[in-house]
Amino acid sequence: MGAELGIYKSCVSARSTDKEILKHAQDGGIVTSLFGFALDEGIIDGAIVAATKEFAHKHPAKAMMDNSNMEFHEPWRPIPCIVNTKAELLAAAGTKYNISPNVSLIKEATRSFGLDKVGIVGTPCQMQAVRKLQLYPVGARDVGSSIALAVGIFCMENFPYQSILQLVEDHAAMKMESVKKMEIGKGKFWVYGKRGQIVQLPLKVTHKYEQPGCHVCLDYVANLGDISTGSVGSPDGWSTVFVRSKIGDSVWAKAMAAGCFETQPIEKVKPGLELVTKLANEKISKNKKTLEERATFGVGKALRNPYI
């Protein structure tokens, strides 16, 4: 495939062999299983993940927030948290379709939490931030070397919390506290209620709610992760996995040897890499137009002297 999929050593369709993880996971349970294995093997001693109010309430010492206002914290607003056990990973599992500032917890993870080997999961832009922090550790000396495993997730765009609130409560007519799961797939935004109700919204409804910063991003598949993963390209209940770096290759090989995953050749599943490539190119083409438009705004040009 072309440059739109980034550099990778291997690509497969995979899912966790742990049935408990699959009950909690969004798709194939890749991130939860990887971090669980990495914790067990001492590859990492903690991971930064996006959790929710319920997790932070149960594990207040693990959350990056002011716990004095916990009762006012909105349901489904992601909270960056540190996890150190499989039980905590399971409690935090699942995709949250709004912005979670996971990278902002890295420095705190190595200092206040005393972690020497940190795992982090994030969107493509967050993987870029992690690599920049490693290359240019301004104000974060010695932090970059503590990042032991970075797992990226596919992302077309993300949403501010208020946008998700509008989509769920106004368009899907469901209260946020009654939502069990949200997902994007098959051209729809899906909202699943705790009482079994399912609402699907056409993606065209969601576009005006997208985070504006997402419209200048040219990375769909988290090119800079050690491993990147997402549901697109694989059958329901499975995930597409790109193994990208030496670190990622080593961890993935060990996890496979330990029986953590079952895999299928990506060439033998439908819709396969053809759909991943199509969406990656669509994101690049669409957002390049935004970049070209912004180039005409005059940003970066010398300011005219207002007194002349």
What do these predicted ranges mean?
Residues 1-308:
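Iron-sulfur-associated redox domains of electron-transfer enzymes in respiratory
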